Amino acid sequence: MAVPQSIPPPTAAPIESKDQVFARSKAFWDNYLRGRPQVPPSFFQRIYRYHREHGGRFGTVHDVGAGIGPYAGELRSQFPHVIVSDIVPKNVQLAEAHLGRDGFRYRAAPVEVADDLPPGSVDLAFATNVMHFADQHAAMQAIATQLRPGGTFACAGFGPARFDDPDIQDVWERISQQGGRILLGMAEHPPDTINVMSRSSKEYNVAPLEPQWFRPGALRIRLNMAQGGITGLLPPERQQEVTDPDFAGPRDVVVYETNEEWRFETDWEGFLQHFRSFPHAGADPAAFTGLLQELKDLLDEGRCLRGCWPATLILATRR
């Protein structure tokens, strides 16, 4: 594989506070869409099948914490009404600019706030790559309140690659942990950020499903976890500061699967796109120079950037 002779710096603008983590430019989001997993059709088919088999209606879906709405168009193919929400108003504006108004409604709000949505008005709440940021119990209460009885909560977490080559994966983990150190140094409330980082790693520990709100037998489907799961940001020296419990309940059904549709092979440019899809990449570019060079040296030896996208999908039915 040919690689450039120099390592170009990340193009994302520096982050000044945690509130800006995903308040990013259109250029950042364009790279995000290229650098993150291309979700296979089977992911959505599984959600729709579960929803149908559990008596769900196909009326209104709420894309919670949607960012710029990369999955809202797919949801619109099955639901005539799609609510697109994000905590960052600019993201909602970008979503509206490319999705339009036909069947879409937009709102700027965090996951935990749903006072403007009539109780029981949503058939499916879709929360992908957002639940780790939220106050878990407040978010689940808001989701449960908006869902109609028999409605579906579909929650997923994926994003960071896991590489087959152990040496490449080792460098990638150290790059990710360096990013975690940078974000923790900028955090207004480091204990909260530590829990966010912990939730989003390994098996994606989110979404307590209280029995008064959800039927027993919710599925926690863990894809491609055999080699360690989702590559996390939390530095090893901060692991002991995690205070979250395990949010999987005793009535939940945990399923482990390997899915070849979530595999990838990329090149150096593809890796840089992936790296730049994380907000910390632009915060302190010099902090990553040596690590990126270490990875480039491995590629110069003929190593390959193959791997998988570990992913978790949670499916639960509202009582």
Curated annotation (Swiss-Prot):
Its EC number is 2.1.1.-. InterPro entries: Diverse_substrate_MTase, Methyltransf_11, SAM-dependent_MTases_sf. Pathway: Secondary metabolite biosynthesis. Keywords: Methyltransferase, S-adenosyl-L-methionine, Transferase. It comes from the Eukaryota. GO terms for biological process: methylation; secondary metabolite biosynthetic process. The keyword S-adenosyl-L-methionine applies. The keyword S-adenosyl-L-methionine applies. Specifically expressed in conidia. Residues 63-155 are annotated as: Methyltransferase domain. Methyltransferase; part of the gene cluster that mediates the biosynthesis of trypacidin, a mycotoxin with antiprotozoal activity and that plays a role in the infection process. The pathway begins with the synthesis of atrochrysone thioester by the polyketide synthase (PKS) tpcC. The atrochrysone carboxyl ACP thioesterase tpcB then breaks the thioester bond and releases the atrochrysone carboxylic acid from tpcC. The decarboxylase tpcK converts atrochrysone carboxylic acid to atrochrysone which is further reduced into emodin anthrone. Belongs to the methyltransferase superfamily. This is Methyltransferase tpcM. It comes from Aspergillus fumigatus (strain ATCC MYA-4609 / CBS 101355 / FGSC A1100 / Af293) (Neosartorya fumigata). The gene is tpcM.
